[in-house]
């Protein structure tokens, strides 16, 4: 807030200083260091008081009005800061940068030393050890690039810095994959950002438009990397990406108030290197977040994460949301995992060594930015000390993949020796506490310590000597920060006090004195201790700077150890859960024998074994598998487990199956279940159609599609028609002939297997005995012809009266209204009892391969159930509309418009 000169003159010098600093950080909560407290004022104080639950008071402001104030002790910063940041706030930490004793009566100099934001923080209390904390920058293109974006993301704690360019329609995918905590954007484009995202699960920070100018961004990057061009990083042709990257780096520098030497390179992030996973797929497969509560339990990462280090855990999460497409890289990872699976001793020994290591990746960032405390350097020492053992294990391993890590890993004995010789084994948490430098490291420091210790020994002896000399048995020698050293005598012995004692302080029951000799020794001790503190600070800073010069080596070691941790962890999972190595190639065949769902099999009750299933997909014969069966029988699990097995294989992990051949996929699509997006005004059906349209418009012949209950969000005929048309579309269009699993409750779709040569029917096996059903969860060839809806309702606990009445109504409807003729194989339910044998399909009129043949909707409609009398006349009009539709020509948009027209007809 701008302050007039009149306002400034009316305030106290301290408050004038506060407002001057606050003007530079108007959008941040300013925590203003005053002695042992952090204080906040005005609106900041009200916010701090409300969020932290601390008292709101007032502070005198000279001739101006008193101002609201709220504060807390400086040592409570670590507990209060997370609450402020997790509320989406920016916090500017203002410290005293001058010793109060040196201020000569004027206001102590203060300055902001750090701005903490959701996306930029080095505070351990704000960070999840096994999750990256990304700051992202988004730049919208203009002109011919109006439908493109530049997107950059950086983790301040590790120095990881990446950039990409993409179509605007891929923004949601990028956000979901990177999961930034904060996104910076041109303040003029905030609304546009919100328009293109269904939800904004991060803090949006607006920046001035000049931050997003190409020349400024380009120069910012050149100055930081100290280069003449960006060609060496392979990003010089990404104009939009350069702007986003420069904006991100500028913002990071502004918040951290210093150099960022650990940000050593910028990488080109190419979506073509990874499987494309849209937000719906990540959510439906529950890779890192549970559908139920967005938590950790029940996710794929909760089963797979057996890593021993935080950096390994972060790397594993990145692998899961960005699986590889390159067969060579996938096989390299599989080779490394296999080496750890085959050699149990090697795996156990590696994991034991990794378990003793610190988070070298983030420790390197702390050292480089001057934030490392003594304990951080000790953690680096302990980690590096383990490397010779790791190298020895890798040398003995018979694996080229692990040998590649051995070749690049550096043990850094000089760095270990330097830290060992300089720091005590268990240093204090803060440098100011002293006693962190080891004896013998500095001759000057040793001399000062000797002086201080001899002085303290003299003081300790003084108490005994003076007690004997004065015959005062209760005489004590003490020290406090205000009066220094003193001799304390109780009032009982006041008459024995010698004349050379000088009274210093009077207490209720005693008096405190000093002597010339004691004051002289006090000055000697305090001078030595002051010099010790200063020298220890200098020595530690020098040591930290020396280690910082090796930041690059630390980061490279951290990356290699993170990979090794992932390999050993994935091997441990494979051993524990009986996974097998998949065969991965560039073909288009997916063939899984005895596959299992990696999460569900671990969460079943004891004694309830998971039933494995085979699954084979290929573009020449079994391109589309239609899976029918009752609700609760396991259709959705079967679909998801195929998606997860394929994903795990391309991560480079072993898979839960007896055997698996995986032809790499470029995308995994899922349309699973029914859900509303009410916040965006989208119904269940519209959400379904949006997701289906995304799949049909973006799938390729190398994609994997998992459709579950498409069309459930609308009427039976609408849903059936759309489901039928989607299957035909995928079958008949070579450019989108993706490998597809299509789970459905529309038994009419079984007829498609006789019409389309690459469509096959499968069903979930069900056993019936004396009116009771058992879901066997086994996938077998053939289509189901019974839904078992009433049986499922009974299992769900509906009252017996409701179940009995439902059976009565069903029997009446089947006997009176389902007049099935010679065309019963076209999809109408049969009156015959359910059979385990797959329907033959002999009664289907169209021959296999006749894609133009569609079900006779008029005949099918005539067979439908009319519970409340004759059909509505509006239905006849809708029949005519349907008869005019050519499913092979209508577009998804036209289909939606036609459905809307039909609904209006019914409403009329």
From Swiss-Prot:
<dbReference type="InterPro" id="IPR007695">
    <property type="entry name" value="DNA_mismatch_repair_MutS-lik_N"/>
</dbReference>
<dbReference type="InterPro" id="IPR007696">
    <property type="entry name" value="DNA_mismatch_repair_MutS_core"/>
</dbReference>
<dbReference type="InterPro" id="IPR000432">
    <property type="entry name" value="DNA_mismatch_repair_MutS_C"/>
</dbReference>
<feature type="binding site">
    <location>
        <begin position="629"/>
        <end position="636"/>
    </location>
    <ligand>
        <name>ATP</name>
    </ligand>
</feature>
<dbReference type="InterPro" id="IPR027417">
    <property type="entry name" value="P-loop_NTPase"/>
</dbReference>
<keyword id="KW-0234">DNA repair</keyword>
<dbReference type="Pfam" id="PF05192">
    <property type="entry name" value="MutS_III"/>
</dbReference>
<dbReference type="GO" id="GO:0030983">
    <property type="term" value="F:mismatched DNA binding"/>
</dbReference>
<dbReference type="InterPro" id="IPR007860">
    <property type="entry name" value="DNA_mmatch_repair_MutS_con_dom"/>
</dbReference>
<dbReference type="InterPro" id="IPR007861">
    <property type="entry name" value="DNA_mismatch_repair_MutS_clamp"/>
</dbReference>
<dbReference type="GO" id="GO:0005524">
    <property type="term" value="F:ATP binding"/>
</dbReference>
<dbReference type="GO" id="GO:0005829">
    <property type="term" value="C:cytosol"/>
</dbReference>
<dbReference type="Pfam" id="PF01624">
    <property type="entry name" value="MutS_I"/>
</dbReference>
<dbReference type="InterPro" id="IPR045076">
    <property type="entry name" value="MutS"/>
</dbReference>
<dbReference type="Pfam" id="PF05190">
    <property type="entry name" value="MutS_IV"/>
</dbReference>
<keyword id="KW-0547">Nucleotide-binding</keyword>
<keyword id="KW-0227">DNA damage</keyword>
<dbReference type="Pfam" id="PF05188">
    <property type="entry name" value="MutS_II"/>
</dbReference>
<protein>
    <recommendedName>
        <fullName>DNA mismatch repair protein MutS</fullName>
    </recommendedName>
</protein>
<dbReference type="GO" id="GO:0140664">
    <property type="term" value="F:ATP-dependent DNA damage sensor activity"/>
</dbReference>
<dbReference type="InterPro" id="IPR005748">
    <property type="entry name" value="DNA_mismatch_repair_MutS"/>
</dbReference>
<comment type="function">
    <text>This protein is involved in the repair of mismatches in DNA. It is possible that it carries out the mismatch recognition step. This protein has a weak ATPase activity.</text>
</comment>
<dbReference type="InterPro" id="IPR036678">
    <property type="entry name" value="MutS_con_dom_sf"/>
</dbReference>
<keyword id="KW-0067">ATP-binding</keyword>
<comment type="similarity">
    <text>Belongs to the DNA mismatch repair MutS family.</text>
</comment>
<dbReference type="InterPro" id="IPR017261">
    <property type="entry name" value="DNA_mismatch_repair_MutS/MSH"/>
</dbReference>
<dbReference type="Pfam" id="PF00488">
    <property type="entry name" value="MutS_V"/>
</dbReference>
<keyword id="KW-0238">DNA-binding</keyword>
<feature type="region of interest" description="Disordered">
    <location>
        <begin position="822"/>
        <end position="863"/>
    </location>
</feature>
<dbReference type="GO" id="GO:0003684">
    <property type="term" value="F:damaged DNA binding"/>
</dbReference>
<dbReference type="GO" id="GO:0006298">
    <property type="term" value="P:mismatch repair"/>
</dbReference>
<dbReference type="InterPro" id="IPR036187">
    <property type="entry name" value="DNA_mismatch_repair_MutS_sf"/>
</dbReference>
<dbReference type="InterPro" id="IPR016151">
    <property type="entry name" value="DNA_mismatch_repair_MutS_N"/>
</dbReference>
